[in-house]
From Swiss-Prot:
One of its GO terms (biological process) is cholesterol biosynthetic process. It comes from Homo sapiens. Induction: By sterol starvation. The lineage of its organism: Eukaryota, Metazoa, Chordata, Craniata, Vertebrata. This is Delta(14)-sterol reductase TM7SF2. Pathway: Steroid biosynthesis; cholesterol biosynthesis.
Length: 418
């Protein structure tokens, strides 16, 4: 019998019907984007040029490659870490421990790929396998999510997430029942959050760059920019891996299909969309425009990193000279809310930086197609939705102090606009 956890959290994502729709819509959207990027018209909207059959999607070679990739990243996860960090306090007052070695995994992966390429590894062949790889990644996500759902049936009540325990199997399968599913000290959610998907994303980008060099003699400036910008983003996330321990994904959401599919399939195969588009639809880009795009990305990164670093520094040590002079609002929980610095400009300055960078990643693809701007459109919707979830949780947690913060900082993401 499944454990219960008392009062159930309000349903999100449209409840069971919304969850059922997203179970189908998310994979369908991913495959549409993969097909559209390689088609002649490259249309974001409308049917793809051709729908592949199972003989195109299913490949034992792709399955072996995908399982080998997961195995490699799991092995790198188990290597000694430069640091072991404690997570947030759980319902039973305990704290889980997490290895901080994601950046180490990125570097070792890069070294292994470099050695493989020097030995003749045909990395440029990877773009031709994106469809079957995406198919086996999706299949893996469904099977893995079923395992997580079954595992949660015997988990103690204290291990369950605030949401994902509605009693509806489809909704709970989608959202995830258990907060931190583990076997021994291997944390499945933490592993998937930043490892196979993010590192896989930059590897796919590199393969697309290599393929363009094979086809056209050298990679285009636009391809270099997309690869460089997104490598910086992934490297930053893995270098500051410890910060993920305070995010909603880790502290609030259960681990179900939503995060499993997102981490393992959606991220590597849709976030690489700009590089996929450039391989099949090369775009001219001059140095003046490239310089402007670099400036836009640098501005977004400066805001993103500055806001996150300020928040993380304040959480670790409010007396740190870098944040000691910032104005705060006291809360009933004992924690303080920053109301100056980056967090006095808007309530989510890190989201603002994220969106500016998303624009910079799309601009090298030109303005003749909407498809490369899918990430910007999707990420805007995602962050607006996440911001609304943040607002509800913070209001519930901090009460009047949060209302005062919202009065002092009226704009949510973009100053004077939203």
């Amino acid at each position: 019998m499944a454990p219960t956890q008392g009062p159930r959290a309000p349903l999100e994502f449209g409840g069971p019907l919304g969850a059922a729709a997203l179970l189908l819509l998310l994979p369908a959207t991913m495959f549409h984007l993969l097909l559209a990027a390689r088609s002649g018209p490259a249309r974001l909207l409308g049917p793809p040029a051709s729908l592949p059959g199972l003989e195109v999607l299913w490949s034992p070679r792709a399955l072996l490659l995908w399982l080998a990739w997961l195995g490699l990243q799991a092995a790198l996860y188990l290597l000694p870490a430069r640091k072991v960090a404690e997570g947030q306090e759980l319902k039973d007052k305990s704290r889980l421990r997490y290895p901080i070695n994601g950046f180490q995994a990125l570097v070792l992966t890069a070294l292994l790929v470099g050695l493989g390429m020097s030995a003749g590894l045909p990395l440029g062949a990877l773009p031709e396998m994106l469809l079957p790889l995406a198919f086996v990644a999706t299949l893996t996500a469904f099977i893995f999510s079923l395992f997580l759902y079954m595992k949660a049936q015997v988990a103690p009540v204290s291990a369950l997430a605030p949401g994902g325990n509605s009693g509806n199997p489809i909704y709970d399968f989608f959202l995830g029942r258990e907060l931190n599913p583990r076997i021994c000290f291997f944390d499945f959610k933490y592993f998937c959050e930043l490892r196979p998907g993010l590192i896989g994303w930059v590897l796919i980008n590199l393969a697309l760059l290599m393929k363009e060099a094979e086809l056209r003699g050298s990679p285009s400036l636009a391809m270099w920019l997309v690869n460089g910008f997104q490598l910086l983003y992934v490297g930053d996330a893995l270098w500051h891996e410890e910060a993920v321990l305070t995010t909603m994904d880790i502290t609030h959401d259960g681990f179900g299909f939503m995060l499993a599919f997102g981490d393992m399939a959606w991220v590597p195969f849709t976030y690489s969309l700009q590089a996929q588009f450039l391989l099949h639809h090369p775009q001219p880009l001059g140095l003046p425009m490239a310089s402007v795009i670099c400036l836009i990305n640098a501005t977004g990164y400066y805001i993103f990193r500055g806001a996150n670093s300020q928040k993380n520094t304040f959480r670790k040590n409010p007396s740190d000279p870098r944040v000691a002079g910032l104005e705060t609002i006291s809360t009933a929980t004992g924690r303080k809310l920053l109301v100056s610095g980056w967090w006095g400009m808007v309530r989510h300055p890190n989201y603002l930086g994220d969106l500016i960078m998303a624009l910079a990643w799309s601009l090298p693809c030109g303005v003749s197609h909407l498809l490369p701007y899918f990430y910007l459109l999707y990420f805007t919707a995602l962050l607006v939705h996440r911001e609304a979830r943040d607002e509800r949780q913070c209001l519930q947690k901090y009460g009047l102090a949060w209302q005062e913060y919202c009065r002092r900082v009226p704009y949510r993401i973009m100053p004077y606009i939203y």
